[in-house]
């Protein structure tokens, strides 16, 4: 009871500080979010809340795919969809509000360009959207379905797990729906709270027959999405919605592909392997810089990119070299995909490990609203875990 009372008292002080409008450092706030600064305007506060926990780091400008154009992530998704519709006359895009451009504007202009028979709205029924997509794909056409938020993909869980993933196997490959791609905005955004912030990739990692992909940047998003659309298996493509406008870089105008199930070593190192995907990649890149500056520690940074089937070889090769592994994701710790990576690595690389594998993830609670800054695995939490590994 004493612990509960202390926690309640801390929360009341936090609310009081907010009501007075002069946030200050509160006891027990921790390094990650100890300082809460006064906001000049509501808009300033919202902007700070959205981008405070990471700094987007663009990739080098690609030169092997022809002319490029600066795009943010939602524009790169639009470009990929535009390329697919232009290349494949059977391709169709559908979902809630898709014909109007979607809530994040990823399909803006496509209905006007390709017609209402190829880009169209659906009722608000996720199970129906995916079931409809399976039917389209079974005919041999290319189906690109949008679930408006990853948090609302669960009504379609049965259609994805028991129908789409198994269709080829239960028919002996007489029929398949491999030309189905399901897009969905994913992850925290700064103000999404319970129903617009979740990272459900681990739910689908236990489902053989589908592929799950999460990009970290506009360049990656376009190349990986095109690969998903062209892949012969049903794919779920989760798009980090906080990066829709926070991330911008040079992206090729013409179509190109980035291979699925191949992790990318973004930065080579010798002391610790850092693994993440989506937005969290930018967090661990900052952690790698902090470790180099403050501790003299060399970190190898890896973007997993494809959750299932994941690239075991690249991760294990790195851990054999460094002897230490830290995995970070926004989803809750228990049952998160970091657990699968950790289990596999300790089986394959046990004698090479110099310290226990560390998982820095979200808490085992529903995603909070005003306490999101405390919930997310920011660079300070990752840095503290890395320091403990080095000192083990």
UniProtKB/Swiss-Prot annotation:
Source organism: Homo sapiens
Disease: Maple syrup urine disease 1B: A form of maple syrup urine disease, an autosomal recessive metabolic disorder due to an enzyme defect in the catabolic pathway of the branched-chain amino acids leucine, isoleucine, and valine. Accumulation of these 3 amino acids and their corresponding keto acids leads to encephalopathy and progressive neurodegeneration. Clinical features include mental and physical retardation, feeding problems, and a maple syrup odor to the urine. The keto acids of the branched-chain amino acids are present in the urine.
PANTHER family: 2-OXOISOVALERATE DEHYDROGENASE SUBUNIT BETA, MITOCHONDRIAL (PTHR42980:SF1), 2-OXOISOVALERATE DEHYDROGENASE SUBUNIT BETA-RELATED (PTHR42980)
Oligomer status and interactors: Heterotetramer of 2 alpha/BCKDHA and 2 beta chains/BCKDHB that forms the branched-chain alpha-keto acid decarboxylase (E1) component of the BCKD complex. The branched-chain alpha-ketoacid dehydrogenase is a large complex composed of three major building blocks E1, E2 and E3. It is organized around E2, a 24-meric cubic core composed of DBT, to which are associated 6 to 12 copies of E1, and approximately 6 copies of the dehydrogenase E3, a DLD dimer.
Catalysed reactions listed for this entry: N(6)-[(R)-lipoyl]-L-lysyl-[protein] + 3-methyl-2-oxobutanoate + H(+) = N(6)-[(R)-S(8)-2-methylpropanoyldihydrolipoyl]-L-lysyl-[protein] + CO2
Function per UniProt: Together with BCKDHA forms the heterotetrameric E1 subunit of the mitochondrial branched-chain alpha-ketoacid dehydrogenase (BCKD) complex. The BCKD complex catalyzes the multi-step oxidative decarboxylation of alpha-ketoacids derived from the branched-chain amino-acids valine, leucine and isoleucine producing CO2 and acyl-CoA which is subsequently utilized to produce energy. The E1 subunit catalyzes the first step with the decarboxylation of the alpha-ketoacid forming an enzyme-product intermediate.
Modification N6-acetyllysine, positions: 232, 241
This protein's name: 2-oxoisovalerate dehydrogenase subunit beta, mitochondrial
Binding of thiamine diphosphate, residues: 152
Subcellular locations according to the entry: Mitochondrion matrix
UniProt entry tagged with the keyword Ubl conjugation: no
Cofactor: thiamine diphosphate
The EC number(s) this enzyme carries: 1.2.4.4
Span of chain positions assigned to the transit peptide in the UniProt entry: 1-50
Effect of residue 176 to Y: In MSUD1B; uncertain significance; loss of 3-methyl-2-oxobutanoate dehydrogenase activity
SMART domains hit by this protein: Transket_pyr
A GO cellular component annotation in the UniProt record: mitochondrion
């Amino acid at each position: 009871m004493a612990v509960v009372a202390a926690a309640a008292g801390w929360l009341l002080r936090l609310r009081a500080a907010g009501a007075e409008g002069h946030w200050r450092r509160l006891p027990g706030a921790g390094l990650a979010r100890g300082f809460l600064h006064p906001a000049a305007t509501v808009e300033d506060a919202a902007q700070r809340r959205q981008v405070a926990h990471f700094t987007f780091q663009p990739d080098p400008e690609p030169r092997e795919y022809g002319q490029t154009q600066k795009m943010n992530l939602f524009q790169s998704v639009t470009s990929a969809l535009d390329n697919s519709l232009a290349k494949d006359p059977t391709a169709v895009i559908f979902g809630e509000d898709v014909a109007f451009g979607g809530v994040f504007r990823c399909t803006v202009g496509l209905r006007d360009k390709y017609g209402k028979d190829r880009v169209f709205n659906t009722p608000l029924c996720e199970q129906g959207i995916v079931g409809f997509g399976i039917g389209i794909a079974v005919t041999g056409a290319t189906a690109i379905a949008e679930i408006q938020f990853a948090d609302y993909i669960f009504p379609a869980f049965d259609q994805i797990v028991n129908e789409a993933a198994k269709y080829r196997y239960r028919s002996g490959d007489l029929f398949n729906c491999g030309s189905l791609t399901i897009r969905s905005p994913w992850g925290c955004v700064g103000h999404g709270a319970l129903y617009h912030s979740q990272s459900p990739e681990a739910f689908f990692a236990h489902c053989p027959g589908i592929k799950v992909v999460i990009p970290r940047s506009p360049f990656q998003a376009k190349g990986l999405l095109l690969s998903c659309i062209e892949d012969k298996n049903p794919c779920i493509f989760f798009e980090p919605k906080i990066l829709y406008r926070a991330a911008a870089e040079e992206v090729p105008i013409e179509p190109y592909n980035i291979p699925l199930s191949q992790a990318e070593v973004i930065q080579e190192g010798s002391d610790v392997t850092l693994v993440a995907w989506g937005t969290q990649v930018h967090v661990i890149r900052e952690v790698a810089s902090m470790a180099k500056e403050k501790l003299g520690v060399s970190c190898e940074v890896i973007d997993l990119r494809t959750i299932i089937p994941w690239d075991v070889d690249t991760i294990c090769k790195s851990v054999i070299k460094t002897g230490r592994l830290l995995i970070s994701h926004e989803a809750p710790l228990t049952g998160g995909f970091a657990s699968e990576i950790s289990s596999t690595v300790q089986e394959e690389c046990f004698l090479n490990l110099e310290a226990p594998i560390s998982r820095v993830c979200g808490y085992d609670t529903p995603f909070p609203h005003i306490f999101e800054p405390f919930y997310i695995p920011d660079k300070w939490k990752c840095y503290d875990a890395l320091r403990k590994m080095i000192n083990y």
